[in-house]
UniProtKB/Swiss-Prot annotation:
The modification Tyrosine amide is found at Y36. Keywords: Amidation, Hormone, Secreted. Pfam families: Hormone_3 (PF00159). This is Pancreatic polypeptide. Belongs to the NPY family. It comes from Ceratotherium simum (White rhinoceros). One of its GO terms (cellular component) is extracellular space. The gene is PPY.
Length: 36
């Protein structure tokens, strides 16, 4: 199963936050995708 992305912290750079947001979206999509 996919691993939950780790929050980079309040001092993260905008690039790190964007990467985290993208990984989190992908993670949630994998969790909520219907399994046929």
């Amino acid at each position: 199963s996919p691993l939950e992305p780790v929050y980079p912290g309040d001092n993260a750079t905008p690039e790190e936050m964007a990467q985290y947001a993208a990984e989190l979206r992908r993670y949630i999509n994998m969790l909520t995708r219907p399994r046929y």
